Amino acid sequence: MQTLKVDLGERSYPIHIGEGLLDQPELLAPHIHGRQVAIISNETVAPLYLERLTRSLAQFSVVSVVLPDGEAFKNWETLQLIFDGLLTARHDRRTTVIALGGGVIGDMAGFAAACYQRGVDFIQIPTTLLSQVDSSVGGKTGINHPLGKNMVGAFYQPNVVLIDTASLKTLPARELSAGLAEVIKYGLICDEPFLTWLEDNVDALRALDQTALTYAIERSCAAKAAVVGADEKETGVRATLNLGHTFGHAIETHMGYGVWLHGEAVAAGTVMALEMSARLGWISEQERDRGIRLFQRAGLPVIPPEEMTEADFLEHMAIDKKVIDGRLRLVLLRRMGEAVVTDDYPKEVLQATLGADYRALAQLKG
């Protein structure tokens, strides 16, 4: 087992990474301060792991709330089901909410914990690669709004993150690839040697090689923890973690939540960010193509939805958390391994990026 730390002073917390950690309740017990525990899961994950986790927490009074699965249910109506479960079970301020599932469950359970009786303890047990390397670390919680993704939420840090890599053995291949989009992101924004490692090991990752997966998760979480420790509330460097997300969130919102997986939209959105970075002369076309090839090898889409027009993108991108005083800030690559957040770009370059021939780029070999 590997343990990392998110350093936030008195609110610091550990990230435990290893195989079989669901069967080690001693990793969770120190972070549960009352008798009551509420496990929040979904209809896909609960049959696989809920009973096992409940057994390992036998010393506590455990209730569970099982939600419908999917991004389409990340909304007010589903959030109310969590509050209904907590109130029906008469859970008080010393309850601990545990998220058992992927990013949607983690975001909603965390937001519920932030709101319930003005804040209760919260634990993350992510079961998808995407949630293990990204959404479970850093305290971003929330729900979607019909007009924009993740526009309603709070920063609310967990007490501990428990990553059992064995849970990836039950993850569908499409979901695994979606998680690889966020892994690749770390190489692009801050760790070019990791990007090279990913190029050498992407096939092993897709084949569920436990050694490769554990290393990729550790390196991704270490990068995320360092950024969050330096900028918890995303006022500066943390925004670079959103590479591809402004374009990607536009895709998710326009196509309908859940039609494209988050990681799939991030992959296509990152290709657009690479294209814009190349058009600005910050990276070469060869470097852009390097990123595209890696996403393709990871089984991810690199062509945005062809039915989306430039106007569609601009409409959705105008409702983005990085918009400040009406200016759209974008995360782009100054070079491979170095990202910047900027609103200093010619409008014509953004327009050309939105209108680029991504189908032609996807055919490039090298």
Curated annotation (Swiss-Prot):
InterPro entries, A to Z: Dehydroquinate_synthase, DHQ_synth_AroB, DHQ_synth_fam, DHQS/DOIS_N, DHQS_C
GO cellular component, one term: cytoplasm
Family: Belongs to the sugar phosphate cyclases superfamily. Dehydroquinate synthase family.
Pfam name, any one: DHQS_C
Localization (cell): Cytoplasm
Gene3D superfamilies in the cross-refs: 3.40.50.1970, Dehydroquinate synthase-like - alpha domain
Any single biological process term in GO: chorismate biosynthetic process
PANTHER family, alphabetized: 3-DEHYDROQUINATE SYNTHASE, 3-DEHYDROQUINATE SYNTHASE, CHLOROPLASTIC
Database matches in CDD domains: DHQS
Source species: Pseudomonas fluorescens (strain Pf0-1)
Annotated binding of NAD(+), by residue: 69-74, 103-107, 127-128, 140, 149
Main location as per UniProt: cytoplasm
UniProt xrefs under NCBIfam families: aroB (TIGR01357)
Function of the protein: Catalyzes the conversion of 3-deoxy-D-arabino-heptulosonate 7-phosphate (DAHP) to dehydroquinate (DHQ).
UniProt entry tagged with the keyword Zinc: yes
Catalytic activity: 7-phospho-2-dehydro-3-deoxy-D-arabino-heptonate = 3-dehydroquinate + phosphate
Pathway membership: Metabolic intermediate biosynthesis; chorismate biosynthesis; chorismate from D-erythrose 4-phosphate and phosphoenolpyruvate: step 2/7
Zinc among keywords: yes
Alphabetic keyword roster: Amino-acid biosynthesis, Aromatic amino acid biosynthesis, Cobalt, Cytoplasm, Lyase, Metal-binding, NAD, Nucleotide-binding, Zinc
A molecular function GO annotation: 3-dehydroquinate synthase activity
UniProt superkingdom: Bacteria
Cofactor note: Binds 1 divalent metal cation per subunit. Can use either Co(2+) or Zn(2+).
Binding site for Zn(2+): E182, H245, H262
Cofactor: Co(2+); Zn(2+); NAD(+)
Gene designation: aroB
Descriptive protein name: 3-dehydroquinate synthase
EC number(s) reported in the record: 4.2.3.4
